């Protein structure tokens, strides 16, 4: 019944992001941020409840494992808000996952970290974004 908090509370996540952005700007560079890949709440629930009482975790989640997705979405929304409020360019990698028929195929067994296919999807999305802002570049130039 105890309240459980994430390892990194949202406020700490946002402040850390702001500090990193500030440090990049101090170096005279232009920061570019990425939004988050989606989480597969069911896989993540299975992963975190492995070897512990999943019923207790489910009770804390209010009986809804999709709560994990919504919680994760708050962190993604915070990144989008930072991009808007600080006028920082953001590359949308999340949509690259979400348009896939089953984006879970691009995540590790833990349901939260990209697997090899997921990392390739992120790389391809980044290459496309870079080519869009650096016209005339080839994939070889960008992949360097």
Where are these predicted regions, by residue range?
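Alpha-helical cap/lid subdomain in secreted, periplasmic
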Residues: 1-144
């Amino acid at each position: 019944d105890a309240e459980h908090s994430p390892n990194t509370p949202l406020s700490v996540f946002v402040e850390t992001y702001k500090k990193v952005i500030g440090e990049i700007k101090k170096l005279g560079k232009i920061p570019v941020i990425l939004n988050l890949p989606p989480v597969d709440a069911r896989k993540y629930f299975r992963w975190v409840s492995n070897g512990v009482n999943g019923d207790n975790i489910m009770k804390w989640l209010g009986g809804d494992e999709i709560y994990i997705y919504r919680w994760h979405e708050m962190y993604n929304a915070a990144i989008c808000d930072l991009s808007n409020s600080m006028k920082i360019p953001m590359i949308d990698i999340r949509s690259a996952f979400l348009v896939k028929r089953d984006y879970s195929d691009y995540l590790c067994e833990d349901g939260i970290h990209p697997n090899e296919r997921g990392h390739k999807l992120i790389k391809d999305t980044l290459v496309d974004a870079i080519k869009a802002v650096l016209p005339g570049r080839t994939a070889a130039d960008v992949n360097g």
